[in-house]
Each structure stands twice: as structure tokens, then as C-alpha cells.
């Protein structure tokens, strides 16, 4: 599939990105290669092949959920100009 300027502009809008003019041709080429690769994948005959969700036999092993106190918050709050309890105190911005 050929990615043209119109398609690239649509993708820019959807992704909320701005591609610099000097990179537009390179992006169109790379996106075209990605779409071509997906087309190749779509041509694969996967009839009779069961979908695989995980490669770990028996699923993901669970661990016990143990709560423990951490000192990360206290360390971060030492850099706060203002704090209240375990929270940053910031100026009110919405009235």
C-alpha cells in the first residue's frame, strides 16, 4: 500500500503529531513498509492453528499479595516546597 500525503496528514491528525517536512518522505516509506508487512501476515493460512495467549505452560504463576510499608513517598516529599500529611500541597488553580 502506498502512503500518500493525504493519508499521512490524516494519520498526523489522528495521532496529534506533527511530522517535520524534512522527514515526511522517510515516514511515508516506513509506514508503507509496515503496511506491506501486515499484508504479508494477513496472507498466512492459519486454519486449524489454535490461538496462543501465553507461552507459559499453566498460565502466569501467582504470588501472595503482601502489603509492606515503603519509604519512597517520604523520600520524594523531602523535595516538596509545601506538603500536607503524605501529599504535595499546590496552589488552587480551579475556582
Swiss-Prot record:
A GO molecular function for this record? Answer: ATP binding
Reaction(s) catalyzed by this protein? Answer: L-glutamyl-tRNA(Gln) + L-glutamine + ATP + H2O = L-glutaminyl-tRNA(Gln) + L-glutamate + ADP + phosphate + H(+); L-aspartyl-tRNA(Asn) + L-glutamine + ATP + H2O = L-asparaginyl-tRNA(Asn) + L-glutamate + ADP + phosphate + 2 H(+)
Q: Indicate the enzyme's highest-level EC class.
A: ligase
Xref: Pfam families: GatC
- Please name the SUPFAM superfamilies in this protein's record: Glu-tRNAGln amidotransferase C subunit (SSF141000)
What's a BP term from Gene Ontology annotated to this protein?
regulation of translational fidelity
EC assignment: the record states 6.3.5.-
User: Gene3D superfamilies this protein is in?
Assistant: Glu-tRNAGln amidotransferase C subunit, N-terminal domain
Write the record's keywords in alphabetical order, separated by commas. ATP-binding, Ligase, Nucleotide-binding, Protein biosynthesis
- What InterPro entries does the annotation carry? Asp/Glu-ADT_sf_sub_c, GatC
Complex formation: Heterotrimer of A, B and C subunits.
Please describe what this protein does: Allows the formation of correctly charged Asn-tRNA(Asn) or Gln-tRNA(Gln) through the transamidation of misacylated Asp-tRNA(Asn) or Glu-tRNA(Gln) in organisms which lack either or both of asparaginyl-tRNA or glutaminyl-tRNA synthetases. The reaction takes place in the presence of glutamine and ATP through an activated phospho-Asp-tRNA(Asn) or phospho-Glu-tRNA(Gln).
Indicate the family of this protein: Belongs to the GatC family.
What's this protein's name?
A: Aspartyl/glutamyl-tRNA(Asn/Gln) amidotransferase subunit C
Gene behind the chain: gatC
